[in-house]
């Protein structure tokens, strides 16, 4: 029993995170030097994400009996994403107005060092609904895979899957080749995931070493407010959605606990995308639903990022004594409904979207971003964890409404203690 616990990924990642915090606190410089370990692990995962999505989506769509089912799945998923993301934005707005974590700081925007956020501001200029939609279409198929753009790969995979389904028996050989290739890819993921504790250790040691636990105290009210709101959203909103669809949010969280720990260590929900594809299938969701909902959710269903965006924007207004009336806050909400869809599940993307939103709204001082630049990294964990849980719940809900969920299999998987899920495609 003790040997099984020690050898489990859950225990190893938890131990690695703890050691990372200790090293970063006691030896800050050495902790900051551990950054390549975390970056290297995330890059290894990113290396494999594009082929994983392609194989999963193509085999899922091509293997379906009816193409109408794919259209229905996509429509229900997008509707769900929009409704739940809007709820997340509204909850963030309500809590930050109620608790007012930035009130009383009386910061003069003119005294803030805006040079630190210049790089983010430049990236933010490229944000917008038209550029975002055009960016979904790759300049070339090879370019989509080379850049690792999830939505571009997803678009090509959907079209490829439709075409493969359309040619019927003629495409059987190609289908089998892609299916076999996916087994090789998931074998590679098995090898990479053994390095998860190393990646989590490096990322956590860097975070504590560079920013220090002391930096949490200065703006701790905003961090505490944000974490509390994320917990409120997970257990109240997602918990209610889960209960309405026949499962417990607590049991689901327990089911994906290894993935949650990896995300906690790396601050990137993208780092467990391949594992989530397999785990959601093992939970009873059809491959076609999982292949569409999970990757799409990484751009369109970022609940944690939505909460962060509203809270951070209003916090800046409160801290700099910038008055925002109800109409201006509603305008901010509408802009965020669009801009939040451009945030990918990687560390730092939420901050870029925040910069884009503040630039677009015009009511808030862009220099105010410097206030939260130092603590943004500490809030990225809660963002990523909330995003991951939200996408998992979304997959189960969409699968259920599309009659693509084996509910008996789901209840059995959630009732039993989480087992090690082998990453293959059998």
Curated annotation (Swiss-Prot):
GO (cellular component) term, any one: plasma membrane
Residues that span the membrane, as ranges: 5-25, 44-64, 76-96, 142-162, 184-206, 222-242, 307-327, 330-350, 352-372
UniProt topology in membrane: Multi-pass membrane protein
Subcellular location: Cell inner membrane
Stored Gene3D superfamilies: Sodium:dicarboxylate symporter
Signal peptide residue numbers: none
SUPFAM superfamilies per UniProt: Proton glutamate symport protein
Superkingdom, taxonomy of origin: Bacteria
Keyword terms, alphabetized: Cell inner membrane, Cell membrane, Membrane, Symport, Transmembrane, Transmembrane helix, Transport
GO molecular function annotation: fumarate transmembrane transporter activity; malate:proton symporter activity; succinate transmembrane transporter activity
Biological processes annotated in GO: L-aspartate transmembrane transport
InterPro entries the record matches: C4_dicarb_transport, Na-dicarboxylate_symporter, Na-dicarboxylate_symporter_CS, Na:dicarbo_symporter_sf
Keyword Cell membrane: yes
Family under the similarity heading: Belongs to the dicarboxylate/amino acid:cation symporter (DAACS) (TC 2.A.23) family.
Purpose: Responsible for the transport of dicarboxylates such as succinate, fumarate, and malate from the periplasm across the membrane.
Protein name (Swiss-Prot/TrEMBL): C4-dicarboxylate transport protein
Organism: Aeromonas hydrophila subsp. hydrophila (strain ATCC 7966 / DSM 30187 / BCRC 13018 / CCUG 14551 / JCM 1027 / KCTC 2358 / NCIMB 9240 / NCTC 8049)
